[in-house]
């Protein structure tokens, strides 16, 4: 890669073109239906398909472009990535959801924006070759104010990638540098159902993490009632984690 640099007194801008050629004359196992995800952050990885028993078959050329804008303190305020894969022939054994099996894959992109400590923005997407139809959205927005941090995530999939439509939230209150209270929830808009919510208290120091977690899980099946579980867990750094469920009769 050959970066193009533009620098002034307030910021530094980098434009980095990327290219990677791969060839595998051998065969690979059939992973056409294997669930794998490609994005702008892993598309140049050596084992981007995360397969342990096969190498990606065929010949391919991965092309990409990175843009970075850093301020005078060398903090990245904005990162933009675009990448796509072209190949000379269709490769059936490659996971279909990735579209890397096609002669021209989807165009994968990401945008990260961190102007200040109060708000951050992250967007990942996958589009058809003409950038006319977005097949995948993953939008994350985070807010931080004093000891309160909350993150929202919106995921929408279509076509080969999937059919999910998810909204997630994680919120944390830091009482001090050792005591934390977190809330997590996930709603599936496709079936109009809240999948779960968690309420977690944690105590952390250099040697251990101790926590109490209440988890409520909902079900789409009308024959199954929502489940409520209370867990105590202890992590000894860096050795192991112990988790123990608490009898529901003690808290109901």
Residue ranges and their predicted role:
Residues 1-252:
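Outer-membrane beta-barrel translocator/pore domains, especially the C-terminal barrels
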């Amino acid at each position: 890669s050959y970066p193009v640099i533009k620098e002034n007194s307030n910021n530094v801008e980098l434009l980095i073109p990327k290219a990677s050629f791969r060839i595998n004359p051998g065969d690979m196992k059939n992973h056409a239906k294997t669930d794998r995800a490609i994005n702008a952050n892993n598309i140049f990885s050596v084992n981007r398909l995360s397969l342990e028993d096969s190498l990606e078959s065929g010949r391919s050329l991965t092309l990409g472009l990175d843009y970075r804008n850093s301020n005078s303190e060398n903090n990245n305020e904005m990162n933009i990535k675009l990448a796509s894969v072209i190949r000379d022939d269709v490769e059936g054994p490659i996971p279909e959801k990735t579209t890397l099996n096609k002669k021209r894959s989807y165009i994968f992109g990401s945008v990260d924006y961190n102007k200040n400590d109060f708000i951050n923005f992250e967007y990942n997407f996958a589009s058809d070759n003409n950038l006319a139809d977005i097949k995948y959205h993953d939008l994350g927005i985070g807010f931080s104010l004093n000891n309160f941090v909350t993150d929202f995530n919106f995921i929408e999939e279509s076509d080969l990638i999937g059919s999910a439509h998810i909204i997630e939230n994680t919120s944390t209150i830091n009482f001090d540098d050792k005591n934390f209270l977190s809330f997590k929830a996930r709603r599936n808009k496709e079936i109009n159902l809240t999948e779960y919510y968690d309420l977690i208290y944690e105590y952390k120091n250099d040697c251990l993490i101790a926590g109490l977690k209440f988890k409520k899980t909902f079900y789409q099946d009308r024959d199954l009632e929502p489940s409520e579980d209370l867990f105590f867990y202890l992590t000894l750094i860096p050795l192991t984690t112990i988790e123990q469920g608490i009898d529901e009769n003690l808290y109901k």
